[in-house]
Amino acid sequence: MVAAALRAASDAPGYPLTAGTPQLRASIGAWLSRRLGVRGLDPDAVLPTIGSKELVGLLPTLLGLGPGDRVVHPEVAYPTYDIGARIAGAEPVPADGLTALGPGPVGLIWVNSPANPTGRVLPVEHLRKVVEWARVRGTVVASDECYIELGWDEQPVSILHPDVCGDSHTGLLAVHSLSKRSNLAGYRAGFVAGDPDLVSRLLTIRRHAGLMVPAPVQAAMTAAYGDDSHVIEQRERYAARRTVLLAALRAYGLRVEHSTAGLYLWATGDEDCWLTVAGLAASGVLVGPGEFYGRAGRRHVRLALTATDERVAAAAARLTAVPTLD
């Protein structure tokens, strides 16, 4: 269905609309309402992006941040939040609590729920406090919600949900991607939505920078956000892999923390992550060292649910065939 939409729109020699087609913006708006409970979103407050990673990496720059500005991100986090701040010349600040930020100004706060790599879900109350804190100070809050349709033991909530932000999207940006929910990483298809004034600023700069999503990809996005059945099917596959890997990791002797949503299992053997990486590698299982995601992750490893069913089953068999850590 998505590939068919891409093919049907492939004869597109002209420049695409940086703002996105009206059909795409309508499809995204309907999805945000239908799946995430977002209300009152301005149709012009939706902007397609070339995947979500380029937006994450460029957002501080696009917002005009630079030397002397602070960009806050989770202590254990996707590295591009840090890199994006550095690209702009701003200061990246890893912090999980608002009190640690002190009285100085903050230009941008990143939240990520469900989180990569931890799979942690932030409760509504926490998100609401972040929004209230930021609005008092004129700080932009950007919420990376790429895994939001992959809730397992907890259901994530969007920063744009009225329980979080009330009746206003002022100061808020939600970032989304088709890479995870629709398994379309190769299409480089995502969007940002929220505060219409902020989105308008981003649109103006992106037009001049040539940051536009190709027309065939916009057509594919329109189809993907209009269909829920393929997402449900993909969720079922991830859920089955998660069940298999959870049991295998526990049998091996690792403790799985958070991991209540998203595509990853965040595990620890209560030792330096590189020792855990080496032990698992000796069994033929490759994992990501938690240190890659910040100093606070140096005793954890990340396992992804993105391998094929056959590879996940093989990894589980290897984990349960070796002596445990206990």
Predicted regions and their residues:
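PLP-dependent class I/II
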Residues: 1-6, 34-326
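A glycine-/small-polar-enriched, mobile loop at the entrance of the PLP active site in fold-type I
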Residues: 7-26, 33-35
